[in-house]
Amino acid sequence: MLGLDTNVLVRLLIEDDASQTRRARKLVDTAIAEQETVLVSLSVLLETEWVLRSRYEVPPETILGLFRAALEARELAFEDEAAVEEALFNWQDSQSGFSDCLIVAHHRQLGCRSTATFDVYAARLPGAFKA
């Protein structure tokens, strides 16, 4: 299994550096050719959202589209994919940030009855409440 770091995933999504994008694509293609899983962890996904939003000023709806396309890409596997899908679904209609949506969704997938939060917007997510 090959795990991707945030900077590699960002290159694959944004393609802003031709040399690094080629190298990232080659890494993934080689892993796939060798029948390896290419994994995107939850922490990498969270950091990627932060980098895209803060460094590249990518709007949330564009990030949502990029993440959905990555989920549909057969060459990538995601840690707790069900939670990622749920988080993206909740994020599209929420005032909460992606990280809050993913935290609540991941907790649900782990079997938590709910997520306690002091965040007013996160408390509005399905499966969360204001502590």
Predicted feature residues:
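A generic structural signal for short hydrophobic patches within well-formed alpha-helices
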Residues: 9, 45, 122-123
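Conserved glycosyltransferase catalytic-site signature
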Residues: 6, 81, 100-101
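Short, high-confidence coil segments that cap the C-terminus of an alpha-helix
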Residues: 35-36, 96, 112
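Short, well-structured N-terminal submotif of metal-dependent ribonuclease cores
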Residues: 1-40, 55-62, 130
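Histidine- and aromatic-rich ligand-binding microenvironments
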Residues: 5, 40-41, 96-97, 119-120
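Acidic catalytic patch
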Residues: 42-44, 65-93
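Acidic, PIN/NYN-like endoribonuclease modules and their adjacent C-terminal/linker elements
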Residues: 104-131
